[in-house]
Amino acid sequence: MKLLALAVLLLAVCSLEGAFVRRQAEEPNLQSLVAQYFQTMTDYGKDLLEKAKGPELQAQAKAYFEKTQEQLTPLVKKAGTDLINFLSNFMDLRTQPATQ
């Protein structure tokens, strides 16, 4: 019985001591968190830059932009023509009542 009580007492003391030590542990302050964040972002940026230097990625990007340009050029031309026609109709409507 005494051994059981001693074991429980020892467990309680160790548990309290562990909680006390955790409270005394230094909490990371805001400055160190921001510094760590910027360091991580810098490392990520460097890795991304190294990957972007590869000719394969550049070729893929060039092909993507060329394909996009091929698809968008007719749409932009049509939109420009439609806009000019639309504005021309408004100008014609304004000039007709003035001439009558």
From Swiss-Prot:
- Keyword Signal on this protein? yes
Pfam families in alphabetical order: ApoA-II
What GO molecular function annotations does the UniProt record carry, in alphabetical order?
cholesterol transfer activity; high-density lipoprotein particle binding; lipid binding
Which terms in the GO cellular component ontology are assigned? spherical high-density lipoprotein particle
Swiss-Prot/TrEMBL GO biological process terms: cholesterol homeostasis; cholesterol transport; lipoprotein metabolic process; positive regulation of phagocytosis; protein stabilization
Against SUPFAM superfamilies, the record matches this protein to:
Apolipoprotein A-II
Q: Where in the cell is it found?
A: Secreted
Q: Which UniProt keywords apply?
A: Cleavage on pair of basic residues, HDL, Lipid transport, Secreted, Signal, Transport
Subunit description: Monomer. Interacts with NAXE and NDRG1.
Task of the protein: May stabilize HDL (high density lipoprotein) structure by its association with lipids, and affect the HDL metabolism.
Instruction: Indicate the family of this protein.
Output: Belongs to the apolipoprotein A2 family.
Name listed for the protein in its UniProt record: Apolipoprotein A-II
Origin species, per record, is Leptonychotes weddellii
Instruction: Name the gene for this chain.
Output: APOA2
